[in-house]
């Protein structure tokens, strides 16, 4: 019988994957998980189990460990911190060598970090809170097809946020009536209109007909206003082949921008479409449909800041970011944090905004945040203050719900935006003086006056479910 050269059986994960003395390398991919361990499982063991299952480990010792340099390839749980205000949960910091991941593949990174490990019995709940992508890995990814500056250059629009509108009702309109709504909104002063996330190619409106009527409206509004206009044509489809077919047709009609539902369609499809857009001079708007399934539970899933980083690597020129003030979930400081991750070339660690690591994007272009969901003219001062210029504000019901029609709703939003930008440029505190600023502008715009009257009582004041963990950040002394 051959002599054993390893110890068979099951051993504690922490004997291999808990390395409290490890100092992460600049080339390591770093992740922080929020963990609630099962009763009786030590925190170091739970953290090590996550590191093992998301890298090289399995449930028992295997002899093939001897055929590789396991000490190099393994994930390392190197730090544990408490979660403020929660005695059961803790943060586990894990470092992964960059060679564990295929270059330029968000798919491969997520398959490791949020794959089988999320069903692990050793933990009651698990949430991926943040990732530090090393610059060496960032450089292997394509990123946004165009970026904020190139988009502004193509549109010839500077010094203010862009304005958009999601056409409503989201389902049921004929292609001709849909195109009519697009034309009225663009003629009234908006920069963009948009397909909703679930508009694809349904019996009431096939995608070819929608594309044709919409682009007729875009060209007509562009000609009449002298401003460059666009509509986010949703090319999300059942297959990649069909997706590219729709993208090519949009290009043939002169569309400047197309749209993709990146989570429901998947990162493989999204990265491929981003590459196509880069090669074909097309802007790419990204909708985040399905994100709340993954990110809203504060104890289990993937935080949206992680999805934001992954999208920037995969590719997209716009991404829905939440509004803070509208109908959709969004903590203010957390939202500002992931907006910075979308736009800035370097974002330092900032626990007050939920950012656990420095993130260096190198020369990768930024993604324009899109504030959309339950917003109207009364929100314009806050939106201007929160997002600044490099953002797109999308008013669906806040445009189409105007008593005088779509064009009037668009005009009201444009007047409100320009009033807020002018006030900000004059040094006025826009958010604090928002009511006064809008009231002054409404004296010269009956459309804005009616919009303000229509939505003066509409607020979405619900408590945020996914709040930032707050309190003193005390580091646990490693045992």
UniProtKB/Swiss-Prot annotation:
The residues that the entry says bind Mg(2+) are: 194, 196-197
Query: Metal-binding as a keyword?
Result: yes
Q: What class of enzyme is it?
A: lyase
Q: What is the cofactor note?
A: Binds 1 Mg(2+) ion per subunit.
Q: Where is the active site?
A: 168 (proton acceptor), 287 (proton acceptor)
Q: Which residues bind substrate?
A: 116, 166, 170, 288, 320, 372
EC number(s) per entry: 4.1.1.39
Residues with the modification N6-carboxylysine, per the entry, are: 194
GO biological process terms held by the UniProt record: reductive pentose-phosphate cycle
Q: Which family does it belong to?
A: Belongs to the RuBisCO large chain family. Type I subfamily.
Self-association state and partner proteins as the record states? Heterohexadecamer of 8 large chains and 8 small chains.
Q: What else is known?
A: The basic functional RuBisCO is composed of a large chain homodimer in a 'head-to-tail' conformation. In form I RuBisCO this homodimer is arranged in a barrel-like tetramer with the small subunits forming a tetrameric 'cap' on each end of the 'barrel'.
Stored HAMAP family = RuBisCO_L_type1
Protein name per Swiss-Prot or TrEMBL: Ribulose bisphosphate carboxylase large chain 2
